[in-house]
Amino acid sequence: MQTFNLTRLNFHSPYKVWAEDNEYKFITDYEVSYRIIFSPNNDIWKEGAYEFGIFNENQKISPNDPKVKGTVEAIIEEFFLTNPNILLYQCETGDNRQAMRARLFAKWFNEYENKSRFFIKVSVLHDDDIDNYIALIVQKSNPELNNILQTFNDFI
């Protein structure tokens, strides 16, 4: 994965983002510390797919902060500007709040001003009585879009 252009990213991000150990971090006005990761995911495709993760590092309760949404959008936008790849997002299941996270992510995406550039598909995988929500995000301009969607559907 190509490293992000932090100058460009921070121009668009409400919160200042910095890179640390191949991760991206920011702290909110409410002192909530977030860590964003992009990990190669070879479960569906052999290459070119990354899994996106958002982690509340200090476990502080995060109020409804629109600047978090704007920062996450800027980070995802920067991902696609530097890496025209496939992005997967799987909601964390440890606290049984994955459905809420999936709804929030879908809401953020539906409100995103550049959403017409992207294709998103959210699916639910049932595994051992746990619902796993996974989202596929890919640019509509990707020449392999139809193959990517077919492969994702076959996997699900």
Where are these regions (language model features)?
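Non-catalytic substrate-recognition and accessory regions of acyl/acetyltransferase enzymes
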Residues: 1-156
